Amino acid sequence: MAGSLDDSIYNNGRSGGGGGGFKFSKGFNKDSISKRIIMMLFFSKGIRAWSCIILLYFLQSSISIISASFYMCLFSAIFSVVVEKPWNLLSSLRPSQIKKIIYHSIFNLLIIITWNSSIKFIGPIGSILASDYTFSTYPLIFNSLLQGNFLATDMSRGSIMLMIGYFLIPLFGISNRLDILGYTSSQVFMIGLFSLIVHNVLVLWKKTIVRSWNSGSSGGKNKLSSLGSCVSTIILFVFKLFEGFSSGSSGSDSINQVSYSQLFVIAIITFILYSLNQFIDDVSEKELTFNVLSKVSLTSSVIFGLLAALFIGFKDFFHPILILSFIFIINAIHILYSKSNDIQPMTFSNNMDGGNSSIKTYNSSGGGGGGSIINGNGSGNAIYYFEILKDVLRQIVDKPTSRRIFTFLVINLMFMFVEMAYGIWTNSLGLITDACHMFFDATALFIALVAEVISQWKQNDKYSYGYGRFQVLSGFVNGIFLIFIAVTILMESVERLLEPPEINTDKLLLVSVLGFIINLIGIFSFHGDHGHSHGGGGGHSHGGGEKKEKHHGHSHGGHGDHQQVTPILGEEKKKKRSVNIDGVFLHLLADTLGSVGVIVSSLIIQIWGYTLADPICSLLISILIFLSVLPLIANTAKTLLQCTPEPIQSSLYQINQFILSIDGVHNIISYHFWSHYDDMNIATLKIQLNETASSNSTLDTERIKKSISKYLNKDHNIHKCIIEFIPLLYNNNNQQQGNDVPLINHHIHNDIHHNHSSSSSSSSHHHRHN
């Protein structure tokens, strides 16, 4: 297993000195110690592989995943409590320590459940190959994916081989006995792949988080970990009781009846998988390089698995594709960690033992190895990208709108995972399908969240107007997404109207009610922003105020001036909308309508047996979704196509008349009005000056520019104005030449900050061209 459930239970074999760890007698030389450690590692990993094979038969025949996880967590907690005696810490627990205990319990709970799920749906040998040492290989794969340049360096080629080896295991290395459990091959693949990836990510996450804690001595950390195991056991016991009630009501509770002999075997398996395995790892990591350690461990697992398959049968747990995956993984590790690539081993401290044990990862010193990945100073590409991720999370939390999107995204994903897990548990296709539908909603929320974060970035040379238009693009994409959903539901409804299918309403009503509640929370969360976008409410905390602060560097204190401007233009409130939030709101509204339709149709079917209620409700919902999303697509498309905003379009005549009435203006050659995003309207004008203004260009153009800018900002909500002045020229015969050969081509670029008075226009930029 790629990470221990409770690292505290195997530290009793170490000394408490500064060097710590298991020590051999001085009578052994270094080569002798290495050989003995390799033999000890080889046989211990083989015994672990056999233990996982026995665990597979328990999971497939007599014990569920929840029950097996409970018993294993119980025995692990007992071993830990006996060794660490954590009750001495209970009387002096601090809030920070309680928080760490909760973290330990959650990690332990999820890691052991996903591990047992991987054993059941992928098989023991495949799970070992695809999970061992991934806390070291996953960051390397992640770094290679971010760098690109596939197959260009040894590091990228090795990463590709690792990904192929890992992916082949859940794709082809499934157990053939799973067909008797009522799962299809696609279900086995998805469940196995999901469990394996989540398990490996949790192990990596646990090591990263716990390693960053500074809680004093390793003994204190071990006691906290022991208490975390006890909390995990209690939570799993509650899950087991709930599972027992559910299976008892359905008459299938015999699967979780465990005998004393089976409990004894599970206790031995737990000791081997967690205590003995980690103790051997701790000893081996101090004397062996990562290259040798990983090769010996994985080779032992495959060889002992083959030996067991010779007596038990290959079809039960050992697919031939595992050998190919093993070859890919071993060769990739050799490429990535060999001396030829200048990869120097470094230590990755164990997450529970205060840094006494270490796992050797990688530190490429450059050259053809693809650059530094991780080094002792915390630099390198992988750490760099993790720092970027932390900064993005900080940006999300800082802004109220993005914080609400992120919060609801997490709630949506949690409900999706619970629904998926319960659907797999009960083998309910309806629950699994609804969970997949919620995944599309989560995708829409993720798109909106990304757009909300990017839109706050400052303008630069490449994006001179900033990143605000990403919100418009997000709204347009989500609108197209909703059109696709509406058309799909419409086609399915018509098909069901023509050929009504048999409908199983089991658990459908419960799931629909829960989904309705979740979506209702989201609707109320985003309704304020959505109402604001249509003119409801005068607050600016989630709309233009944040963008103005980001793009122009002004505080919210300037809103008072802005509020003096908005009443003059009655149509401005209509334009103050966040199409990004509109897209999220419409997604939630569509999902809520879907839940309402399912609730209504389920009640009609259960009460009156009228099965056509389901396609009729779906048909009505698809039409409502289609009609509600059309305004969003129309508005975002007009913005992306740079159409003249509707309030300005209806006032073009007044704008032209005002500009022509200014002293010094001879003609308007061309004008363009467009919206960059929700709160930024832009005007570009080419104005021809008369003879008087042309002869005194600097003073007159400044006066004309101020008049036009003030008028457009105050009366028409135009925030940026770019004006090009063309003089009216005369030739030697005193005939007007228009703007054929201008002597002065004077561009005036004026940024109008709408939370300031019109006097700020004096900060405009002047460019002269001959």
From Swiss-Prot:
Residues 532-566, 751-770 are annotated as: Disordered. The keyword Acetylation does not apply. The keyword Transcription regulation does not apply. Keywords: Ion transport, Membrane, Metal-binding, Transmembrane, Transmembrane helix, Transport, Zinc, Zinc transport. One of its GO terms (cellular component) is recycling endosome. It is a multi-pass membrane protein. It is found in: Membrane. Residues 58-62, 118-123, 176-184, 246-262, 313-316, 426-434, 491-507, 614 are extracellular. It holds the Pfam family Cation_efflux. InterPro entries: Cation_efflux (IPR002524), Cation_efflux_TMD_sf (IPR027469), Msc2-like (IPR045316). GO terms for biological process: intracellular zinc ion homeostasis; zinc ion import into Golgi lumen; zinc ion transport. Residues 1-36, 84-100, 147-154, 206-224, 284-291, 338-404, 456-469, 529-592, 636-770 are cytoplasmic. The chain crosses the membrane at residues 37-57, 63-83, 101-117, 124-146, 155-175, 185-205, 225-245, 263-283, 292-312, 317-337, 405-425, 435-455, 470-490, 508-528, 593-613, 615-635. GO terms for molecular function: metal ion binding; zinc ion transmembrane transporter activity. May be involved in zinc transport from the cytoplasm to either intracellular organelles or extracellular spaces. Belongs to the cation diffusion facilitator (CDF) transporter (TC 2.A.4) family. SLC30A subfamily. This is Probable zinc transporter protein DDB_G0291141.
